[in-house]
Swiss-Prot record:
Keyword Aminoacyl-tRNA synthetase (UniProt): no
A GO molecular-function descriptor: lipopolysaccharide binding
Protein name: Prophenin and tritrpticin precursor
Species the sequence originates in: Sus scrofa
Sequence repeat extents: 132-141, 142-151, 152-161, 162-171, 172-181, 182-191, 192-201
Protein's cellular compartments: Secreted
Record-annotated disulphide pairs: C69-C80, C91-C108
Amino acid sequence: LLLLALVVPSASAQALSYREAVLRAVDRLNEQSSEANLYRLLELDQPPKADEDPGTPKPVSFTVKETVCPRPTRQPPELCDFKENGRVKQCVGTVTLDQIKDPLDITCNEGVRRFPWWWPFLRRPRLRRQAFPPPNVPGPRFPPPNFPGPRFPPPNFPGPRFPPPNFPGPRFPPPNFPGPPFPPPIFPGPWFPPPPPFRPPPFGPPRFPGRR
């Protein structure tokens, strides 16, 4: 019983917390990275349901962001400031809480897409669907629709009214055509018979009263 009591505390002392396991995974990513700067944990999703076995792989989803610390310095990422407009990566996979075992499977992709903690369990191989020939069943036949069209009354819009045109007429000069050269007309006058010769009446010598 004493030996069992000594083994149990030693096993519990080797167990890490969920956040410590993720930080260890971030350190491993920085060691395997070929980029110039270190990455630091930016955000950690909610941990899954607690499991008593620390050696069981647990799904994890977190986000890392580029810092200002160069990778060759091997400075702890938690002491580095985030780089302005630095690259952000979304990481998913599984980790263990056992200090002896290393993180199992972590994949990081650049972007800001978020995944839930149970996302790795959905990455299962898709079953290949069996191909069946298309059915050769004739489709239903429907008669063409015979709906009467809408009836609209004829439009009764008054026609446009335009004022009478008031354009001045063209001005032409009076014609100045020379008349045809006709000779003056010669009409014969009326014919009258010549008057008879004048003959004075046969009067005697004049007589005056009172003289003899």
